Amino acid sequence: PDTPAVAHQTIEAAIAKAKKLYPELPLFAAGKSFGGRMTSQCMALHPDATIKGIIFYGFPLHGPGKPSVERAEHLKEVKTPMLFLQGTRDELAAWNLIEPLCTSLKLATLVKIDGANHAFKAGKQNILQLLADSTNEWVMKKIKKG
């Protein structure tokens, strides 16, 4: 992956381009793993950003086998709603750490994906459809709220 500075610049450019192309539409930012974490870091640095929410597909809370919540310290600075889609077997986000973290963030919603790892592998379940449906439901609620 890129450095955080490069990732932040890329995210800012993507948001600016989307706002320019579709100024009338509500804008949500999403990322898988590092992309989601960099998006939330960027939004913590720019709380005035006009996105309606951030969607995390497997937030990388810590390195494999190194349980910690340090990577999430910036989340309390994020001023927009956040959706965390997390597997219970995610090797980069121990469930016993990610669940209380999300509970502590008043703007966070956590969707538990039983048996899924960081790549959202969970046997024969159709996880992609679950991710899409959960995202759609959350986004529609946020749009209706205004």
List where the protein language model places each region.
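Catalytic histidine neighborhood in serine/cysteine hydrolases
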Residues: 104-119
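Conserved alpha/beta-hydrolase "acid-adjacent" motif
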Residues: 91-97
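Serine-hydrolase catalytic machinery in alpha/beta-hydrolase-like enzymes
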Residues: 1-28, 41
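Short beta-strand immediately N-terminal to the catalytic nucleophile in serine-hydrolase-like folds
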Residues: 28-31, 57
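Catalytic histidine-centered segment of alpha/beta-hydrolase-like enzymes
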Residues: 1, 116-130
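A conserved short beta-strand
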Residues: 49-61
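Short beta-strand/loop motif that positions the catalytic acidic residue
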Residues: 78-79, 84-86, 90
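Gly/Ala-rich beta-loop-alpha elbow adjacent to hydrolase catalytic centers
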Residues: 31-39
